Amino acid sequence: MTIDTYPPNSPATAGPISATRVHLPGSPAFDAGTRLWNGAVTRRPAAVVRPTSRTEVQSALRYAADTGIPVAVRGGGHDWAGRALATGGLVIDLSLMRRVEVDVASQTALVSGGSTAADVVAATEPFGLVPATGTYGGVGRSA
């Protein structure tokens, strides 16, 4: 469901974004969107947006720019320094954007920001292609 009007302090005020994509502390989606590989990182954002399209990413970025709040982008949440979180800011969690398009002729792939190494391997394997990647499939990938 997409809603066209939002509270004034919502990431959705910047444009059309589903209210179901904006998550606040205490919700399971907020917890999932702030979970990191490095458990020592203690940054606590104000909200998480889990977009499924470029338009929703743009809306979240416009909101952050208009309000001056910090933004962090979370792919797989595997960064050792915890840069996927911004204290008091907005996390754009790309985990729902996991598309991988393989161009066999050029042996390249277009990889969405929420894709993992396992997603890339699974997409290239049917074509006999092997991407340069580590051994843990849960690590985020984008290129």
What annotation goes with each model-predicted range?
Residues 1-143:
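N-terminal accessory segments
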